[in-house]
UniProtKB/Swiss-Prot annotation:
Null mutant phenotype: No visible phenotype. Double mutant abn2/abnA induce an almost complete loss of this activity.
Annotated protein name in UniProt: Extracellular endo-alpha-(1->5)-L-arabinanase 2
Upregulation: Repressed by glucose, and induced by pectin and arabinan.
Organism: Bacillus subtilis (strain 168)
Family: Belongs to the glycosyl hydrolase 43 family.
Pathway the protein takes part in: Glycan metabolism; L-arabinan degradation
Annotated compartments: Secreted
Record's signal peptide: 1-26
């Protein structure tokens, strides 16, 4: 009887040992998609919200399953009911019937402050203001415009408006620094990216700043969508930016620079001052002058191979970012288009990790609840699909090449080099003589519907490389 019972228990334990990993680690995550262009994230009461252009918004409890709340500017939109009357001055000034990228923050009074903006589109004629609500889902009531651009004559800083030097007043992001001061970074193309110190009680800029302090850009260089996130572990402020054009052929890509102070100066991984980054005088959209600068986290790519359908993005950009103080995890939230789908776009979230040089690297696949855990060498070795994001601003979609990470720590295949696991999950990789560092991470591949080993690494030139086994 005892022997029979022992055999039954042993067999049950053996079955569990072989089946449990599949149920735990290969369970298919559930995603629900939404479309919010230029998503700016805020967390409140355990729920994540994103607000974007055209008064679009969505919410999620887990950053994976999203619920669309609003989609377009109309008088029926519950965020700002009767919006064309409520923001009449804004629409009239901008000569527009829509709104651009919004940002929402909560101030000490518990109220939610929505920074809205409208732009004519073919010129930097724009207006920016703030509306306030007791509930994050609205209704928001207008408190007024505080910045205008694109005017003929005197600008907000008291000098004649010059579109090569002065900002286009769109794409705001408000944030608190580590000392509790409130700031707003903003700007798109035209004269560049600027920052203002804000009144934390009123939500308006402190007086006497004009357009504020310039951080980078100018001469109509294609830089926009600024977003600042402080990381208490590295004690740096990270300024995220989008370079290029937002459409499927515009070469949109996500970059980052950092500073020890919220208002700069900001530098890239090579130590270049971002204040000097701009197009040449007398030019429009001079991408060649700006593309060497800033750490490029991702651009257009596909993990597609010869024998299987892959996954990829086209013109990912206009991101926000979130740091979870409880877990210490960071996330990159952005919109993206997709190969073969034209101008359709959806929100995506990728986890961020800091490499040993204090720069963020983005997980190759979308966030599916994964955590950074210890990995073993035997799980790392094998054949990988490799993406090199480079530094260019281009409509080209980066394609994969194949490499092998061998047991003897060499790399062979279409590129050669070396690799080493330097900690529980940290990666040192050399490819074609360039040194990269970052992380090894097991992630969910939604095309093959299984967990795979990946790596995300960055070199000192600010070039990101991803691998997927």
């Amino acid at each position: 009887m005892f022997n029979r019972l022992f055999r039954v228990c042993f067999l049950a334990a053996l079955i569990m040992a072989f089946t449990l990993p599949n149920s735990v680690y290969a369970q298919k995550p559930i995603f629900k998609e939404v479309s919010v262009h230029d998503p700016s994230i805020i967390e409140t009461n355990g729920t994540f919200y994103v607000f974007g252009s055209h008064l679009a918004s969505a919410k999620s409890n887990d950053l994976m399953q999203w619920q669309q709340l609003t989609t377009s500017v109309s008088n029926d939109n519950p965020l700002i009911p009767n919006v064309y009357e409520e923001l009449k001055e804004t629409f009239e000034w901008a000569q527009s019937d829509t709104l651009w990228a919004a940002d929402v923050t909560q101030l000490a009074d518990g109220k939610y402050y929505m920074y809205y903006n409208a732009c004519r589109g073919d010129s930097p004629r724009s207006a920016m203001g703030v509306a306030v609500a007791d509930n994050i889902e609205g209704p928001y009531k207008n408190k007024g415009i505080f910045l205008k651009s694109g005017m003929e004559g005197t600008s907000s800083d008291g000098t004649p408006y010059d579109a090569t030097k002065h900002p286009n007043v769109v794409d705001p992001h408000t944030f608190f620094d580590k000392d509790g001061k409130l700031w707003m970074v903003y700007g798109s193309y035209s004269g560049g990216i600027f920052i203002l110190e804000m009144n934390p009680k009123t939500g308006f800029p402190l007086p006497g700043q004009g357009y504020g302090k310039k951080l980078l850009g100018g001469n109509h260089s294609r830089i926009e969508g600024p977003y600042v996130l402080y990381n208490p572990d590295t004690q740096y402020y990270y300024l995220y930016l989008s370079y290029g054009g937002l459409d499927a052929t515009g070469g949109y890509n996500i970059r980052v620079a950092r500073s020890k102070k919220p208002d700069g100066p900001y530098y890239d991984a090579e130590g270049n001052p971002m204040l000097d980054v701009r197009g040449k005088g007398g030019t429009f959209f001079d991408d060649r002058s700006i593309e060497p600068y800033g750490v490029k986290l991702m651009g257009s790519y596909t993990f597609e191979t010869e024998n299987e359908k892959g996954t990829g993005y086209v013109s990912p950009g206009h991101n926000s970012a979130y740091y979870d103080e409880k877990t210490g995890r960071s996330y990159l939230i952005f919109h993206t288009r997709f190969p073969g789908r034209g101008e359709e776009h959806e929100v995506r979230v990728h986890q961020l990790f800091m490499n040993k040089d204090g720069w963020p690297v983005a997980a190759p696949y979308r966030y599916a609840g994964e955590t950074l855990k210890e990995v073993k060498q035997k799980d790392i070795t094998g054949t990988y699909k490799l993406i090199q994001h480079g530094k260019d601003i281009s409509a080209d979609i980066k394609q994969t090449i194949n490499i092998q990470l061998n047991k003897n720590h060499t790399i062979s295949g279409e590129m050669t080099g070396t690799w080493r696991k330097t900690g529980k999950n940290t990666a040192d990789i050399t490819l074609a003589g360039k040194k990269y560092n970052g992380v090894f991470l097991r992630q969910w591949d939604s095309v093959r519907e299984k967990n795979v080993m990946t790596f995300s690494v960055l070199n000192t030139s600010g070039e990101a490389v991803w691998g997927s086994k």
